[in-house]
Amino acid sequence: MQEGQNRKTSSLSILAIAGVEPYQEKPGEEYMNEAQLSHFKRILEAWRNQLRDEVDRTVTHMQDEAANFPDPVDRAAQEEEFSLELRNRDRERKLIKKIEKTLKKVEDEDFGYCESCGVEIGIRRLEARPTADLCIDCKTLAEIREKQMAG
């Protein structure tokens, strides 16, 4: 696997992918105004495009690297590498769907509010995780419930 293809995406790299600086709120500025929606639309579109490029590179890499190794160990190693790449791409495919769902919310001007309680999620949280659909309090409660159900 090529270096850089398997990196974790932090909030700073998401902003860097989009080529934008963290949003600077102005005093008294209305939450999720046109400028903020545009800011997040740029971030989400750039992130989605970067993930799509990763998928395309994986397909090309797998086609270029596919070889019928006579040695079973070499063949097994290649199959394991391809399997790992496909699992990563499957996760990215699911993330692309979530990004597209979030872009629809931006278009509908329904972005940035908690789906559970309706409060503002907040600019900084959304820059860290643009697909967040719960405020930090509701997300914390959901995680506590999830742990209780699992344990």
Curated annotation (Swiss-Prot):
Keywords assigned: Coiled coil, Cytoplasm, Metal-binding, Zinc, Zinc-finger
Coiled-coil region: 34-54
Gene: dksA
Subunit structure, as described in the record: Interacts directly with the RNA polymerase.
Places the protein is found: Cytoplasm
Record organism: Salmonella typhimurium (strain LT2 / SGSC1412 / ATCC 700720)
Stated role: Transcription factor that acts by binding directly to the RNA polymerase (RNAP). Required for negative regulation of rRNA expression and positive regulation of several amino acid biosynthesis promoters. Also required for regulation of fis expression.
UniProt GO BP: regulation of DNA-templated transcription
Family: Belongs to the DksA family.
Superkingdom, taxonomy of origin: Bacteria
Name the UniProt record assigns to this protein: RNA polymerase-binding transcription factor DksA
